[in-house]
Curated annotation (Swiss-Prot):
This is Dual-specificity RNA methyltransferase RlmN. Specifically methylates position 2 of adenine 2503 in 23S rRNA and position 2 of adenine 37 in tRNAs. m2A2503 modification seems to play a crucial role in the proofreading step occurring at the peptidyl transferase center and thus would serve to optimize ribosomal fidelity. [4Fe-4S] cluster binds at residues 152, 156, 159. One of its GO terms (cellular component) is cytoplasm. The keyword Transmembrane does not apply. It comes from Granulibacter bethesdensis (strain ATCC BAA-1260 / CGDNIH1). The gene is rlmN. HAMAP family: RNA_methyltr_RlmN.
């Protein structure tokens, strides 16, 4: 495994234009609280290497201690300074007095009949988000579906999370902490190296929230995850799903270069305006153009177009052909997802014949189009079913 210094070169940050700046200004209104305990101790999880070095310098620790701590936190998964044998006991005590290495609290953990597991995590301010582990049905590996926000601002009509207004963004510690807590649950520490099999083999940013509306925090969390001296998960094993925040897609491709998934779900603006209201701001033409220029896309790393199959709504043969026309020339695959019902939902999943017919048309055009087998439906852990009871407190002036 390469070290951080030998990893893929870090891209220079892209200077934001006016629309990027507007998005980031709005994100600041939903900023996470500081990663500080009530007793004043600072959380080291979620800090970049530079921030960790600075935090230790403030208490007189040399820079090499940051490298040691990084190894203990992200490679070994350790939360107790007292067992860090490469650090002298007096310094262990100083670290414990000034810092913590946190995990989100597990409020609830449910396991499906198909072994999918869902956690309800509570953060320091009492807000909650859900995380799901989806095991591969054949091999000893699986994906961790991570949330980026508490609630969501997009109000997609078929999505349970969309019925929960946005409360706030999650910070880097809360995002990477979901993956670390999942590793705790499955005992996958220290981090597997090289070709060693990983039970938690991939991350999909497909949980609660729109990752590109919380881009800076997501970016920092994923850079921590990808660092070769810690968790060391390759960017090829990370997929970010967006409903189409077009201005941030270029930055994501340049700065993170992770795999991209697009929540498409319709092939006309008229229908997508209804199903995915964000389409009114960034219509299909602009979204597809952004996909064509996404820097990380290639035949080896295809863009995934996610398509929720709704009975009688978006599952006709004509729509399958239009989908093929839209994505022609893009290195892509199409995931067909039968709608997963949730309490109060108004849709039903497409019928098996419609699913098979749609898939066949897309496949015959040269695109892989698997029909996703629902996982975790019985515990409301399937695609589009996540939701918590967190609410944004009204400010009292």
């Amino acid at each position: 495994m390469t070290s951080a210094s030998q990893a893929a070169p870090v891209a220079l940050p892209v200077m934001p234009d006016a629309e990027d700046a507007r998005i980031m200004a709005k994100a600041a209104l939903f900023a996470p609280p500081p990663s500080v305990m009530e007793d004043g101790r600072k959380d080291l999880v979620g800090l970049s290497r530079e921030q960790l070095t600075e935090a230790l310098a403030e208490i007189g620790f040399p820079a090499f201690r940051a490298k040691q701590l990084w190894h203990w936190i992200y490679h070994r998964g350790e939360t107790d300074f007292r067992v860090m044998s490469s650090i002298a006991k007096p310094q262990q005590e100083t670290l414990a007095e000034r810092f913590v290495i946190s995990r989100p609290a597990v409020t609830e953990c449910l396991t499906s009949v198909d072994e999918t597991r869902k956690w309800l995590f509570r953060f320091r301010d009492g807000q909650e988000a859900e995380t799901v582990y989806i095991p591969d049905p054949v091999e000893d590996r699986g994906a961790v579906c991570i949330s980026s926000q508490v609630g969501c601002t997009l109000s997609c009509r078929f999505c349970h999370t969309g019925t929960q207004p946005l409360v706030r963004n999650l910070g880097p510690a809360e995002i990477v902490g979901q993956f670390m807590a999942a590793r705790d649950a499955y005992g996958e520490w220290p981090s597997p190296k090289g070709e060693t099999p990983r039970l938690l083999s991939t991350i999909v940013l497909m949980g609660m929230g729109e990752p590109l509306y919380n881009y800076e925090n997501v970016k920092q969390a994923m850079r921590i995850v990808m660092d070769g001296d810690g968790i060391a998960l390759s960017r090829r094993r990370i997929t970010l799903s967006t409903s189409g925040v077009v201005p941030m897609m270029d930055r994501c491709g340049t700065e993170l270069a992770v795999n991209l998934a697009i929540s498409l779900h319709a092939v006309t603006d008229e229908l997508r305006d209804e199903l995915v209201p964000l389409n009114r701001k960034y219509p299909i033409r602009e979204l597809i153009a952004a996909c064509r220029r996404y820097p990380a896309a290639s035949n080896a790393r295809r863009i995934t177009f996610e398509y929720i199959m709704l009975d009688g709504i978006n599952d006709s043969e004509a729509e399958a052909r239009e989908l093929v026309r839209l994505i022609a020339g893009i290195p892509a695959k199409v995931n067909l997802i039968p709608f997963n019902p949730w309490p109060g939902s108004q849709y039903t999943p497409s019928r098996p014949k419609a699913l098979e017919r749609f898939s066949r048309i897309v496949m015959e055009a040269g695109f892989a189009s698997p029909i996703r087998t629902p996982r975790g439906r019985d515990i409301l852990a399937a695609c589009g079913q996540l939701r918590t009871e967190s609410r944004k407190e009204r400010r009292i002036d």
